[in-house]
């Protein structure tokens, strides 16, 4: 299946767009950009992607690709989402921010959030969305890892990518 969509954004969010042409010189292995431009929700998401792309291009051998999955959430245009039961008792869809897939089939799902949301009952580290993805992780521990990155600034610190970089080099790590 091939889905097509038009990317729309508010004018005050234009700084959160990132195009393939902007990253071409830093992306010699052509990772990411399964649609163009990417329309990030926040500066930390954009910061994470740029840094992850740089890491992927340094160590590309085991990497299939990185996908920004948080920008297209319409179920008619994407088939990657996690269902979770909300506090209202109804089922809802959650589209995590990123998916990194290795050539051996192992995947790491990444969510980037503001530190403010760490304890949020829906979006937090132990929130309903995270628990739903961790349920997937438990079903497929040999193939799936889930990481949440919380930041109190407009960027993701380099050390916050350490678990993702370990995943790229060595595979899965379920230490927390």
Predicted regions and their residues:
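Electrostatic, structured charged patches in enzyme active sites and in nucleic-acid/phosphate-binding
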Residues: 1-176
